[in-house]
Amino acid sequence: RSGNPTRNAFEECMTSLEDGIKGYGFSSGVAAISACVELLEPDDHVIAMDDLYGGTVRLFNEVKTKSQGITVSYVDMTNFENVENALTDKTKMIFVETPTNPLLKIADLEQIANFAKANSILSVCDNTFASSYIQKPLNFGIDIVLHSATKFLGGHSDLIAGVLVIGKDDRELIDKM
């Protein structure tokens, strides 16, 4: 569907909670992640946190690397030198989850956002475990924040939904999404 009043209200609410520009609702958190990865081209490289939700790892390793031709380097982002060392001329996205699932690792979002901007790389943060109540990645300069609404946003695991919010007024990014 191109529009739905309930989904529109959800997107507007999440955009407001995250201090963003534009939000998009999805049928699941993995669907939101998949939509972010669709912004990439074949042979693009992603630097990803080494401790991610298993569904994200499977999406990267079993689906997107095969169907889309991207490559992924998993690094421990608690040591920022690992991010710097993983950079290649094909790196187009940094994908961070903080705190991570399941080990609760914490990455410096402002440092990641600044590095991404300095290298013209899209920064994406899975904020599922923190929620916008505790942490607002867009306020640290992250380009896109996403959530699996099934977990803490829903509160009871009685719904399946996902959302992503764009944090900068980037018409090209909004149009692509």
Please describe what each predicted stretch is.
Residues 23-177:
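Conserved PLP-enzyme active-site core in the AAT-like
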Residues 1-16:
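A glycine-/small-polar-enriched, mobile loop at the entrance of the PLP active site in fold-type I
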Residues 20:
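Walker A/P-loop NTP-binding active-site region of P-loop NTPases
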